[in-house]
């Protein structure tokens, strides 16, 4: 029987991929629930995953431990499965400060957040795809275990419209309002609809095209997909389904019942506080909850509404919330990428969330039912995901013990060997590393540097910038889509060096990187243990000149183990290449945006700076003085041509170089 998935790739399975794909698919087809793939960096684990998905023909959830790697996997699976639905589901917050209370200083911190509209659209598209079709691959972060609206309520709220249906225009408007669309006849943007005479134009929250519904009396005369900017028809449709604009949908009757239940819980909690002489807490919970209930009655919404989700969805005390996993209908496959990191992360989410909320409950800021607005605990997660493939270069004991089959993938299809590992003294490590960096830059290769602290990363970035290197610092405060852009710019050569702490280990796929430098490699701990070292060294495994330099004054047990394992794998790979006459080749991959996003309008400043970057890339000049002279020359030329805006931007660029270099005279 033909698979519902179809891979598009110029490559065929090679190296250890052939046996790995066969063994994994065969194990699952024979009833195995847990399988582990131990695959070295650059061995094509993602391609193996795609082949397994195609062979099994099951809807698939791919779980990654951070947004950057999830975005990279999303791009790769989209390229493998262009005819299928490949979706992206991560937290839509650019910034998130959860509600919290600090008893020691009597400080209450209000919830504060900033939502990324593009990611919100992708999340909604993911759930709509799961309801529409079976050939779906969703790449997700740990966000998939957090509470989401009930799939039953979500499905029941879908507005189905068909040409020839008899329905009043106003009835369609009411349905759209119920599923959280806003009527706005002026601003036709995502999640809004407008009414123009006998037609309604809807901009679905999960799509880039609009939908026009035209009526003739009380009958739907035509349905069209339209360009949301020009309103021109793209395609005539026989029918359409409008999915809710938000995941949390609750009907009016349910809200009334929920309010009654919340008031009953409030009464019991206030009585509990009074019995324990906690009068302040009693007054606090009464005033806060009553205010929320007034807002809910009048507006159908209140700040922190998620804290009442148990009542709004009709769950029992302690019952788990619905999450993305519940939207998978029937049998599906879970792939846990970099499982040695992702599995512990899943286990830690529940405990961290409960600790914060318990304090809010104890001091009267929230009702006890707020504790049920939570991520899944680990046991619930295991129960929901019976068919699981763990993927890692360094799987933990948990995965190995749970798996009925462990498959190794050491031989790379490209014949590439594991990197050469060198250990060097920390004495003059920055200058020594600079020499190695310049060697790589001269031949168009890239460099990753990993440090132990944020301050060291920042200082090193500043130092290398001052001496003219094109360097970027990747850290946790950089927004999700901007991290993706930095990695793309490294591949394109806008940057030569990328510096980070914990973001340069698992999964980053950058074939141009030929050198990985690990500073303070002998400082045993989370970032310098065996698994971390293996993962970090592996970042150079996609380049034929791959080298890892470990700066250390002693060889720790973790270093020795990592070096020995790298040598073991390298020997197996060398023997294989010798036997079959294979010449190693650097992986060649196109440089694309990992996540396609709507093009933002660029300002004239953006365009000028881009031009400056191309013309006056600092690495082309022997020193900063020459670079400044060139910028000054260009500035005077722009002023002479009366292009004062360009001249001002060039002046600012020139001054910024002076500011960064105090030793330079004006």
UniProtKB/Swiss-Prot annotation:
SUPFAM superfamilies: C-terminal UvrC-binding domain of UvrB (SSF46600), P-loop containing nucleoside triphosphate hydrolases (SSF52540). The keyword Glycoprotein does not apply. Residues 26-183 form the Helicase ATP-binding domain. Residues 625-660 form the UVR domain. The UvrABC repair system catalyzes the recognition and processing of DNA lesions. A damage recognition complex composed of 2 UvrA and 2 UvrB subunits scans DNA for abnormalities. Upon binding of the UvrA(2)B(2) complex to a putative damaged site, the DNA wraps around one UvrB monomer. DNA wrap is dependent on ATP binding by UvrB and probably causes local melting of the DNA helix, facilitating insertion of UvrB beta-hairpin between the DNA strands. Then UvrB probes one DNA strand for the presence of a lesion. This is UvrABC system protein B. One of its GO terms (biological process) is SOS response. CDD domains: DEXHc_UvrB, SF2_C_UvrB. One of its GO terms (cellular component) is excinuclease repair complex. The lineage of its organism: Bacteria, Pseudomonadati, Spirochaetota, Spirochaetia, Leptospirales. Its main location: cytoplasm. Keywords: ATP-binding, Cytoplasm, DNA damage, DNA excision, DNA repair, Excision nuclease, Helicase, Hydrolase, Nucleotide-binding, SOS response. GO terms for molecular function: ATP binding; ATP hydrolysis activity; DNA binding; excinuclease ABC activity; helicase activity. It is found in: Cytoplasm. The keyword Cytoplasm applies. Forms a heterotetramer with UvrA during the search for lesions. Interacts with UvrC in an incision complex. The gene is uvrB. InterPro entries: Helicase/UvrB_N, Helicase_ATP-bd, Helicase_C-like, P-loop_NTPase, UVR_dom, UVR_dom_sf, UvrB, UvrB_inter. A motif (Beta-hairpin) lies at residues 92-115. ATP binds at residues 39-46. The beta-hairpin motif is involved in DNA binding. Residues 429-591 form the Helicase C-terminal domain.
